[in-house]
Amino acid sequence: MRAVVQRSLEAKVTIEGNTVGTIDHGFVVLLGVGPTDTEADSDYLAEKISKLRVFSDPVGKMNLALADVGGQVLSISQFTLYADTHRGNRPSFTGAADPALGDRLYQAFNAKLKALGVPVATGEFGGDMQVSLTNDGPVTILFDTEAK
C-alpha cells in the first residue's frame, strides 16, 4: 500500500462540480492499494499517518501530530500510485489492486483513521475527482508498506 501525505492549510475534492469533501487543515492523503495488500497494511498506514509529527510546535520544530493541532484528513483513492512507466510512454496500472480489494482497503483505512479520532473527509473511490489544496511548507511524505 502506498500513500502520499501532503500537509495542507486547506483542501477540497469535487466531482462534477460538487464539493464532496473538504478540510480546514491537516493532511491530504493519496492512497494506492496493491494486489497483495491486506487490512493489516491499511491499519499500519492509518496508525503511522495519525501519529506523524510534522506540524510545528511553539519553537518551530516539526514535533506535533494531527491530534495536537486539531487536524483533519482528506483521503483520496489513487490507483495511479502503482503506475509502471518502464516501457513506452503510456503507464501501465497492472500493479494496482483490483477495484474490489482497492475499495475495501481504502474504506478500511478511512475507518481506522476515524477510530483513532481523526476527522476524515473523502473523495469517491474510482471517481473522476478534482482535488485542490494549499500545500503547507510544502511538506510531502511518501509511505510504502512494502518497505516497513
UniProtKB/Swiss-Prot annotation:
The question of whether Methyltransferase is a record keyword is answered with no
GO terms, biological process = D-amino acid catabolic process
Spans through the membrane:
none
Q: What does the UniProt keyword field contain?
A: Cytoplasm, Hydrolase, RNA-binding, tRNA-binding
Tell me where the sequence motif Gly-cisPro motif, important for rejection of L-amino acids sits in this chain.
137-138
Q: What class of enzyme is it?
A: hydrolase
Gene Ontology cellular component list: cytoplasm
Task: Write down the superkingdom of origin.
Answer: Bacteria
EC number(s) on file: 3.1.1.96
Q: Report the catalytic activity.
A: glycyl-tRNA(Ala) + H2O = tRNA(Ala) + glycine + H(+); a D-aminoacyl-tRNA + H2O = a tRNA + a D-alpha-amino acid + H(+)
Molecular function terms from GO:
D-tyrosyl-tRNA(Tyr) deacylase activity; Gly-tRNA(Ala) deacylase activity; Ser(Gly)-tRNA(Ala) hydrolase activity; tRNA binding
Gene3D superfamilies xref list = D-tyrosyl-tRNA(Tyr) deacylase
> Where is this chain's protein located in or outside the cell?
Cytoplasm
Q: How does it assemble?
A: Homodimer.
What's the record's remark on domains? Answer: A Gly-cisPro motif from one monomer fits into the active site of the other monomer to allow specific chiral rejection of L-amino acids.
| HAMAP family assigned | Deacylase_Dtd (MF_00518)
The entry's function note states:
An aminoacyl-tRNA editing enzyme that deacylates mischarged D-aminoacyl-tRNAs. Also deacylates mischarged glycyl-tRNA(Ala), protecting cells against glycine mischarging by AlaRS. Acts via tRNA-based rather than protein-based catalysis; rejects L-amino acids rather than detecting D-amino acids in the active site. By recycling D-aminoacyl-tRNA to D-amino acids and free tRNA molecules, this enzyme counteracts the toxicity associated with the formation of D-aminoacyl-tRNA entities in vivo and helps enforce protein L-homochirality.
Similarity comment text for this entry: Belongs to the DTD family.
Name this polypeptide is given: D-aminoacyl-tRNA deacylase
According to its UniProt entry, this protein's organism is: Lacticaseibacillus paracasei (strain ATCC 334 / BCRC 17002 / CCUG 31169 / CIP 107868 / KCTC 3260 / NRRL B-441)
